[in-house]
Amino acid sequence: MNIFDIMGPVMVGPSSSHTAGAARIGYIGRKLLGFQPAKADIGLHGSFAATGAGHGTDRAIVAGLLGMAPDDPRIPFSLQLAKEAGLEVSVHPVTLRDAHPNTALMTLTGSRGRTVTVSASSLGGGRIRVNSIDGLEAAFSGDLPTLVIRGRDEPGVVSEV
């Protein structure tokens, strides 16, 4: 732990968990899809759902999906910017079993139909943890370069490598 963990990240507020962490969750979702999504279905769990609109959690996640950093001054306008960019957004409460209270479940769809479903939690101070990708357990923060490989588990695939 260092002084920046205590002070919190440089960000557009009001909350390091509900705004900065949420923006990072959206950004990681974008990176896992590989490009800006055309459609985003965003489920907010626990305190994300209870106070998300007031803390700008919805706007922060969408800002991350648009490629914005947690300190981007455009975050408060991200829902309008998403509309202008052709990104269809749906935000709703969701109940997730045994999940951290600041968890988002996003299903992101690209313009050519590629999808990725990401569950991630905001841990405080702008820190996040990715919990699952397409239903498979994961545990990484995105602070360091992380390689995610998708493969087909069927006979003969390894011989093609």
Indicate where each model-derived feature is located.
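Short, hydrophobic/aliphatic alpha-helical segments
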Residues: 1-11, 40-43
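Conserved phosphate/anionic-ligand binding catalytic regions in large, soluble enzymes, centered on
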Residues: 8-28
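Metallocofactor- and cofactor-centric catalytic cores in central/energy metabolism, strongly enriched
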Residues: 37-41, 158
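Broad gene-expression machinery/nucleic-acid interaction feature
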Residues: 39, 86, 101-105, 115-117, ...
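A structural-propensity feature for long, helix-poor, extended segments
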Residues: 41, 45-84
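Contiguous domain-boundary segments centered on the initiation and propagation of an alpha-helix
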Residues: 66-112
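A conserved regulatory-domain signal marking ACT and ACT-like small-molecule sensing domains
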Residues: 91, 117-161
